[in-house]
């Protein structure tokens, strides 16, 4: 009696061996691998895979983006994919379509983000600032082990949709109030003393009430506004203009802007209406440097390209950098 010998399947291997194999593969391929089978989907989002990548020292820096589309009830998650071996170039002002070497690839996920707070984490505590349209000076805090947010010391001025960042164990908050409120335009919360202190006045050139994002880079705070102005604040020094980004500013227009700390550099995302009235999401990676013999801060565009085309009615929800 003849019978076919069943060939062994990769999935017949123990999970530990599959995890070891997945940990050696670039995360650029994870979105496609997650579509192969349920086992892969489960392992690719497991904590065990993170541990394996850290142990093998194969962890990578990736940028994730959450977008909301009009025809879908929940937001969709994307990750920035860069074709291995690609020589990245600056495509700004070249009137070319995407090279397709850099793309935002959708991640199968049930992730849903709908929290009316701007959340920042300090140690084991999560602090929240209101993101509603009505100005509020309230701040809330929750320990990781708790369920509910508790009241924290109020800010010195009411703010609507302010931006914040954690730096050296302190929470820096800027914007969300009238630009002429120079005394309170920016303030910093000391976690240890539980007190607020006003930041130095950046002057009328930088004092804009609508801020897109604050990020920490090379021990300084990098601020991007809706008015297409870039500035850097050194808590030990003063505010400075970021030079060398004129080409970037000409291309940003009034599109949605997001800034992510990406592998020691700054990653900026924005959108522009294309010829078909959809929107192209652009991505640029910026390296900042302080020129020798000068206090000037310069930005260098390492690469820029279209990474995704979306309906014009889409909504940019948030972005996140991960490193594993």
Swiss-Prot record:
Signal peptide annotation: none
Record's keyword annotation contains Transcription regulation: no
Protein's name according to its UniProt entry: Putative F-box/kelch-repeat protein At5g28160
Superkingdom classification of source: Eukaryota
Kelch repeats: 170-216
GO CC, one annotated term: cytosol
InterPro entries in the record: F-box-like_dom_sf, F-box/kelch-repeat_ARATH, F-box_dom, Kelch-typ_b-propeller
PANTHER family the record matches: F-BOX DOMAIN-CONTAINING PROTEIN, F-BOX/KELCH-REPEAT PROTEIN SKIP4
Domain F-box span(s) in chain numbering: 7-54
């Amino acid at each position: 009696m003849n019978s076919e010998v069943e060939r062994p399947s990769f999935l017949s291997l123990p999970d530990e061996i599959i995890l070891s194999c997945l940990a050696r593969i670039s995360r650029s391929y994870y979105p496609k691998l997650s579509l192969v089978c349920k086992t892969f989907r489960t392992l690719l989002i497991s904590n065990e895979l993170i541990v394996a990548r850290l142990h093998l020292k194969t962890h990578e820096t990736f940028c994730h983006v959450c977008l909301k589309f009009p025809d879908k009830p929940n937001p969709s998650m994307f990750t920035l994919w860069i074709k291995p071996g690609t020589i990245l170039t600056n495509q700004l002002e070249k009137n070319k379509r995407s090279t397709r070497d850099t793309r935002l690839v959708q991640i199968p996920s049930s992730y849903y983000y709908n929290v009316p707070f701007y959340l920042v984490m300090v140690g084991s505590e999560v602090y929240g600032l209101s993101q509603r349209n009505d100005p509020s000076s309230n701040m809330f805090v929750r320990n990781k082990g708790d369920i509910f947010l508790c009241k924290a010391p109020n800010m010195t001025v009411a703010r609507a949709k302010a931006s914040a960042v954690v730096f050296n164990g302190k929470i820096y908050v800027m914007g969300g109030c009238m630009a002429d409120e120079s005394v309170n335009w920016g303030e910093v919360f000391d976690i240890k003393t539980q007190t607020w202190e006003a930041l130095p006045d950046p002057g009328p050139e930088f004092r804009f009430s609508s801020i897109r994002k604050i990020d920490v880079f090379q021990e300084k705070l990098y601020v991007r506004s809706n008015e297409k102005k870039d500035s850097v604040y050194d808590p030990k020094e003063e505010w400075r203009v970021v030079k060398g980004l004129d080409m970037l500013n000409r291309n940003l227009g009034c599109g949605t802007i997001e800034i992510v700390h990406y592998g020691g550099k700054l990653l900026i995302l924005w959108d522009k209406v294309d010829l078909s009235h959809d929107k192209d999401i652009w991505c640029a990676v910026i390296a900042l440097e302080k020129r020798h013999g000068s206090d000037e801060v310069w930005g260098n565009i390492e690469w820029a390209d279209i990474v995704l085309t979306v309906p014009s009615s889409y909504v940019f929800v948030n972005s996140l950098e991960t490193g594993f």
